[in-house]
Amino acid sequence: MKIAIGNDHAGTEYKMAVVAYLESKGIEVLNFGTDSLDSVDYPDFVHPVASKVNDKQVDLGILICGSGNGVAMTANKYQNVRAGLCWNKEIVQLIREHNNANILCIPARFTAVAQVIEMVQVYLETAFLAGRHANRIGKIPLQC
């Protein structure tokens, strides 16, 4: 499995913990995030992750910023991306089962590092249920 990860300054500590967790599981990680606490612009780190997910060059993506909203809004501009903002593992389970989310967006300012590791574990272990949910996902793209 290969996962792309990106973060802004608010998510640096979380990203480092998530990368360590993923690598301990033998997962290849492409790190597009900052390693600094200096202020940066989150879209600069979202676009490489979303592009890799969109083009199916990685299996999944993880994005981390202060609220999670900016990274989710940016990632969801990509045609083949379904980015979900989550703040607990129950929501993570639903974005995978019902929405087949391929990018997990994490709000660093509203979660704890240990909680985020649990969320990532659920993200990796939860499968898409398909069925009626596949039909719904098929209706997401704009038909222009």
What are these regions (language model features)?
Residues 28-39:
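A short beta-strand-loop structural module common to alpha/beta enzyme folds
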Residues 4-24:
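Glycine-rich phosphate/diphosphate-binding loop of Rossmann-like nucleotide-binding domains
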Residues 47, 51, 73, 93-96, ...:
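Alpha-helical segments flanking ligand/cofactor-binding loops in enzyme cores
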Residues 38-47:
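Structural motif
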Residues 48-85:
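Helix-adjacent hinge/juxtasegments
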Residues 4-6, 10, 89-144:
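C-terminal binding/interaction regions
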